[in-house]
Amino acid sequence: KHNLTNNWGIGYGISYRYAKDYDFQTYDNVSGNIKPENTEAGLNEQTTGFYFSLNKNWATGTSFSISATGEYYTIGNYHKWAVYPQASLTYLKGPQHIFQLSLSTDKSYPGYWDMQSSVTYLNGYSELQGTPGLRPMTNYNLNGTYILKQKYIFGLFYTHTSDYFAQTPYQATDRLALIYKNTNWNYMRMIGANVILPLSMGNWYDARLTLVGMQARQKCDRFFDVPFDRKKWLFIGTLDNSFKVGKNLSFELIGNIQTPFIQGTLDLASSFNLTAGMKWNFAKDRCSLTARCSDISNSSMPDMKVRFKEQYLDMDSGAYTRTVSLNFTYRFGGYKKQKVKGVD
């Protein structure tokens, strides 16, 4: 990176990454009617990138930056050229009003094991299949934010993910089997708004209310023999409360609720999470005792089902997500962190 005159700056670079992967799976002492096959496979992955950026800062606090990364990616027989742009703009109309606009792109890669042709049998009914040729997903994010009085936040967002992949269950039509398999979708798209509102009463109560509303669209033309194109509205609300009782005792209570949602052909039920905690400092602040219970109602994991075309499935994970923790800390008096000299 280089700093230029008048608060301009530029940056550039080049990168190369190579990875070689080898996976194998063998079975021994197999019982029942399952006839698994031993598998082995290797992958070579190469990524070459070129980067350039430009930025500018003004004395008023306004700033902007743009950048682009060109990439040539290859794995197995898959080759792709792509450009990933980034841009951000911050405009200050005084300290009480701040506007921000940003565009970002990133890439998520599947695990190497997910790209193999192996089959892992979870039990006599369920199996996990690999997906040779599974492609990375590319995510584009556009965000606009308005900050009022440096604490109230209002935002709009749009997200488009091409080649989105997720593990979705499928009931085979030619045999009695439930297949879990990562599949590239056409896209996953989300558009919505969010609000963050801090609340307070005197010196004893502080809270933050976060509200999110969005619509998601998920499309896949090649999901076995049941292609889907689904839309769903989602609303999320979180209230984070903090109570101070005197100087040394404080409590927290956090509630989160989420309306039903979708993942491919799956329908996810609503979920709720209530967490409570306490912190007590004593012995002249040398000792602290912290207690916390997360997911008190054990309802943060949503029930899942499939009611799509000829697919009919109920999934009950039986997950127990409630946790209780107790932590005690003692600080020895007079302790001072030693300074470490730098290497000459």
Where are these regions (language model features)?
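Face-selective signature of the C-terminal outer-membrane beta-barrel domain
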Residues: 1-80, 85, 92-96, 152-155, ...
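Transmembrane beta-strands of outer-membrane beta-barrel pores
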Residues: 14-20, 68-76, 103-109, 119, ...
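Residues on the lipid-exposed face of transmembrane beta-strands in outer-membrane beta-barrel proteins
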Residues: 1-2, 46, 50-56, 87-91, ...
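C-terminal beta-barrel architecture of Gram-negative outer-membrane proteins
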Residues: 216-218, 237-281, 287, 297-298, ...
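Outer-membrane beta-barrel translocator domains and adjoining extracellular loop/strand segments
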Residues: 22-31, 75-84, 112-120, 125-127, ...
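Outer membrane beta-barrel strand-and-loop segments of large Gram-negative receptors
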Residues: 43, 135, 153-210, 219-240
